[in-house]
Amino acid sequence: MKGTITRRMISGGQAMIAQIVLKKGDTVPRHSHHNEQITYVVSGKLRLLLGEQGEREIVVAAGEVLVIPPNLPHSAEALEDTLDVDVFAPPREDWLNRTDDYLRKGG
C-alpha cells in the first residue's frame, strides 16, 4: 500500500467491506471506479476532493458518512490519524486482483 495506508477487506458476491487505516498526511490519489462507495469514518478526519479537477471539497469527520457515486473521480487526504470503513457495490475487482496501481505506487 502507498505510504502507511493499510486495509483489510471481506468480499461477498454483491458487495465488499474494507477497513482502511491512514496516518495523518497519507493521501489516496485521484481515481474513479464503477462501484458505488460508502465511506464511514470511525475515527479521525478525511478531506475528499470530488470531481475531475477536485473542485468539490468535503471533510468527513468521525461518525460521519459520505456516499460517492460510481465513476466520480475523487482523492483523499487524512487530516488526522484515521480509521474508516468503506463499502463498495459491486466488489472492487482491482482490489481483489491487486491491479489497484494508484494505491501501490510511490510512498
Question: Where are each of the predicted segments found?
Answer:
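Short, conserved beta-strand element in jelly-roll/cupin
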Residues: 21-23, 33-48
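Short acidic-glycine-tyrosine-enriched beta hairpin
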Residues: 54-70
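A short, N-terminal "cap"/entry segment at the start of jelly-roll beta-barrel domains
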Residues: 1-14, 18, 97-107
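Histidine-centered metal-chelating micro-motifs
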Residues: 27-29, 47, 66-75
